[in-house]
Structures are given as structure tokens and as C-alpha cells.
């Protein structure tokens, strides 16, 4: 299920990457703007997906896989925490490729492989698949930290508080809605209504800018 959800950032980045690569040849300032917009979009999508998966994990497992997989719910809850970083890491690594920093990506990947192996050796014997899930979360966080560092070094700094504050408040409201309605409504209705709640909050908080609209129009024309 997590792998299926992980397709979302790949689709977003694949749509934006040709623009990003082209802008690097034209202007580093334009590249920075598209990177910052891409980072915002992925944070905007990742937060509700992660929180929704966390809060609805039991219902999702039961609906999709049945009773026999209910024991995997704790693992899905843990892995849902990694989704935020999985989403954002896509753009961090691809933006470095766009500025010809493939070796930097290789260093990051090598570091994360080492971290993941070490964590698996320490955690799996004692905690089993929960330990493996925890190792995945920590590895994605390490990749996120390294990605932010190198993007700040070669392209621009990322103001995470400014980017994530409105989506964070919106997803908190969405999460409250899920908690209050899960026991009363059908799963499909909860997902649809919680998504509407989230994006309504984003609109009310004026998360979207004129530049967002311009980028969207550019993507549609492409």
C-alpha cells in the first residue's frame, strides 16, 4: 500500500522535471522558483496522505486486504510517518540531478544504505517487521536532512516553517474531522470529505499563490 502511494510523488516530479531541467539552462532564479513551488506541492499532498493513512490504517487494511492482514496495521502506521519524507525526497534528489550533482546523490544514497543496514541489524532481531518499518522511517529522515543540506548548498535554502505551516494547520483540522467521523461514515465518504475539508482549509488560509496558478497553466499546456 505504501509503495502504491509512493507513485504519487513520482508522477508529480515527472511532470515538473522537464521544466526544472530546462530552467537550469535558462536561469538559476527560475529553477529556484520551480523547486520551491514543487516542494510546496509535495508537502501539500504528503501531509494529508500521511495523516490519512495513519488514522485510517485499520480501515484501509481491512477493506483492501481483509481480516488476515489486520496484524500489519501497526507496521502501516509506522510507515505512514515515512510518507512525508518519501514525497519530499523525490524533488530533493531530482533537483540535484537537474544541476548535475549526480555524485552528491550517490553520496546521499550510499549513506542511507549504510544507515538502513545498520538499523535493520539492530532493530529487526528484536522488533521484527516493526523494526524494519522504523528503520525505513529513520532512513528517509536522514535522506531528507542530507537533501535539504545539499539543496541549500547548491541551489537555495528551504524555509520549511513557511512552506508547511498552512498545510500543517489544515491537516490538523482534517485529522480531527477523520477522528470524529470514522465510526459513523463509510470509509469512502470519510476519505472524500476529509480531502474536501483539507483543501477548503488551504483555500481559506490562502495557501495558493498567483505563481501556483501560472505553473498549473504551464503544465496543462504541456
Where are these regions (language model features)?
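Interfacial segments at transmembrane-helix termini and the short loops linking adjacent helices
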Residues: 36, 44, 53-84
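Interhelical loop/hinge segments that connect adjacent transmembrane helices in multipass membrane
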Residues: 19, 24-33, 154-167, 214-219
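Hydrophobic alpha-helical transmembrane segments of multipass membrane transporters and ion channels
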Residues: 40-48, 81, 85, 170-177
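Helix-loop junctions and terminal segments of transmembrane helices
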Residues: 1-40, 46, 93-98
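Short alpha-helical transmembrane interface motifs in multi-pass membrane proteins
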Residues: 1-2, 41-45, 74-78, 93, ...
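Short runs within selected transmembrane alpha-helices of multi-pass transporters and secretion channels
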Residues: 6, 10-13, 51, 55, ...
